[in-house]
Amino acid sequence: MRKRVYFDNASTTKVDEKVVREMLPYFSEIFGNASSQHDIGIKAKDVLERSRRIIAKSIKANIGEIIFTSGGTEANNFALKGLFFSNYPQKNHIITTKIEHDSILNVCRWLETQGAKITYLDVDEEGFVDIEDIKKSITDKTFLVSIINGNNEIGTIQDIEAIGKLCREKNVLFHTDACQSFTKVPINVGKQNLDLVTLNAHKIYGPKGVGALYIRDGIQITPFAHGGGHEKKLRSGTENIPGI
């Protein structure tokens, strides 16, 4: 039998056996809707909030600042679209780089059809963005800088603390896609001046179809999905308890 060597963990990881064991009871035993008031629903709600607390603690956030999503792509869509529609038309300018994940670049291209102005910054031969280029690109119409933390193709780890400091000084929101870097490099939303952070599970030996968006308390953002009012009325839809 040929032995398989897997080198594509940057794309997705195998679900860890311990994770599978932890998930199983929530398919067949504690299968309730976390919004239900009966015993099984309350237990599902308890584990939902326990998971939210663990994620929040891992990035030094408050528990109420974590919104669960269906993955990193949805979280990126939520961050960019939600902020655009809550700031437009007073502000319509976003700064990003040319080497972002497709779920940033294609959202930016779509937002351009809705009235957004996007600056796509170049990077150097190692994939780093120049802080001065960000600074020079900020205008009175800029409301967001979105730059990936750890690049999904070449592995460059941006200096998000320096970028966050600049954005805070300029009163511009800063979003980073940390799907590739989460659990691999430290994320401290306060120290690094992060306003929104995208996370997901399937890059860290968890299941596909689940992610999260950190949204700093006080930020005004247009809801991503309307319905039953789940996730602080920002992302309606019954939560994926086994995945979360």
What are these regions (language model features)?
Residues 1-244:
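Pyridoxal 5′-phosphate
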